[in-house]
Amino acid sequence: MYKRQGVVTSNNISALPFYGLARGFLTGKYRQGVTVDSIRAGSVTDYQTERGWAVVDALVDIARAHHSSPSAIALAWLRANPAVSTPIASARTVEQLHEIVEVVHLSQTEVNILNRASA
């Protein structure tokens, strides 16, 4: 999304990010140095960069402060972006569904922390 942020905002259009949780990478399940036993683990390798890990760390920290999940925080971060009309996320389990329907309101400071981590 952020690669195209300038194009979207300069043309006064909104984006609809299809992978709002970056194929599961932003759920907090993937952590640096931890092997995840999942058939989907291979789909997140492109996100496993210094920047990606910084975003996950920030999501986890903010989630703790809100007594929430990294998934809920990631979706709140997208909702806080005026260029995003609505994020799309999917769930495989009931537990995941509870995480993605939770509504969290982030402070501007928290949004800034996430924006800096993703820059």
Model-flagged regions — what are they?
Residues 1-2:
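Short, small-residue-biased leader/transition segments that mark boundaries at the very start
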Residues 6-60:
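Glycine-rich, positively charged active-site loop/lid region within alpha/beta enzyme cores that binds
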Residues 18-19, 77, 110-118:
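Tryptophan-centric aromatic hotspots in well-structured domains and transmembrane helices
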